[in-house]
Regions:
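A solvent-exposed, acidic/Ser-Thr-rich amphipathic alpha-helical stretch
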Residues: 25-77
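A beta-strand edge to alpha-helix "cap/lid" segment located at domain peripheries
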Residues: 2-7, 20, 55-142
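Short acidic-aromatic low-complexity motifs
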Residues: 2-33
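Short N-terminal signal/transit or membrane-insertion segments
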Residues: 12, 36-47, 135, 140-142
Length: 142
């Protein structure tokens, strides 16, 4: 792994730490000013701009108390891909649920310039791959 790839992975890890804490300074230190975060069409429109995205994650933390864990992460050049687990609390049930997904990051000058998020919510149950042995493979579990 090259030094720039290792740096890019550390930036993504710091971004996830910022999502976990809701700390605007940490989040902004990882984002390009013109970052775009894309979601699946059934979820949200793209979020554009570092300030907007950082404030989004701060609010998300305050409302749903998510805790992300990066399960796998790889880098190639200026792109990083992570597979993650997130336990969170939907407003309707107040019960902790597990959400799993992947994100593709495009980096620019050791900052996140683009995020493509692949996951779906299930407010009434866990959003996981059916039958996948998460615990046996060392993934975060509830």
């Amino acid at each position: 792994m090259s030094a720039s790839e290792a740096t890019n992975i550390e930036v993504v890890r710091k971004y996830i730490d910022g999502c976990n804490s809701g700390d605007l300074t940490d989040l902004l230190s990882t984002l390009a000013p013109d970052v775009i975060h894309y979601f699946l069409p059934s979820q949200f429109p793209p979020i554009r701009g570092a300030d907007h995205l950082a404030r989004y994650w701060r609010k998300y933390k305050a409302v749903l108390d998510p805790v992300w864990s990066i399960d796998r992460i790889i880098a190639q050049g200026d792109e990083v891909v992570s597979e993650w687990s997130c336990n969170w609390t939907p407003k309707a049930t107040k019960a902790r649920l597990m959400l799993r997904g992947s994100e593709w990051y495009v980096m620019r000058d050791a900052r996140i310039a683009e995020v493509r998020a692949y996951f779906t919510y299930a407010d009434n149950g866990n959003a996981e791959l059916a039958g996948f042995p998460y615990g046996e493979r060392g993934y975060l579990t509830l």
